[in-house]
């Protein structure tokens, strides 16, 4: 996996985590 793809994946996980916290 490339560094760019990894950071992109990390960003996606962060977005999901934030939206999950917002729901609660």
From Swiss-Prot:
GO terms for cellular component: cytoplasm; extracellular region. Expressed in mature brain, thyroid gland and testis. One of its GO terms (biological process) is negative regulation of execution phase of apoptosis. Induction: Down-regulated 6 hours following staurosporine (STS) treatment and up-regulated 24 hours following STS treatment. Down-regulated 6 hours following beta-carotene treatment, while it is up-regulated 24 hours following beta-carotene treatment. GO terms for molecular function: receptor antagonist activity. PANTHER family: HUMANIN-LIKE 10 (PTHR33895:SF3), HUMANIN-LIKE 4 (PTHR33895). This is Humanin-like 10. The gene is MTRNR2L10.
